[in-house]
């Protein structure tokens, strides 16, 4: 993801000094800057995915035989992670397709995911099931991922508010 993230900043920086760069990409500077912002958020999402993957072993090693509170918390966390994945996917699609409706829906889902994550965090603190520490670390990354998805949706909305740029004004 880090290598892919370098592409939008490189093009954006070149576009500041080279007008042909913008023409070659067939986008205007504001659009290019939005792509840069989205790429930056996706890079952060990828960082959280790596962290979640690294912590997954700790979560799995904390599970025991039989149904426990930890299993219930893990199921809630898995559902939250799926909802967060949908937020990111919807927000990214909204940014690429300039869809305000999708961006607003992604923001609504983002807010719900963050609220659900905070509620689960409180429940983990109160119940303190086995493996709660590892679960809370994964939960933190899942919530931050949802927030990054919300940031992508905000970029999509901001891009939709711009007036079209006429030829020669890029």
What are these regions (language model features)?
Residues 1-170:
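Cytosolic, long alpha-helical scaffolding segments
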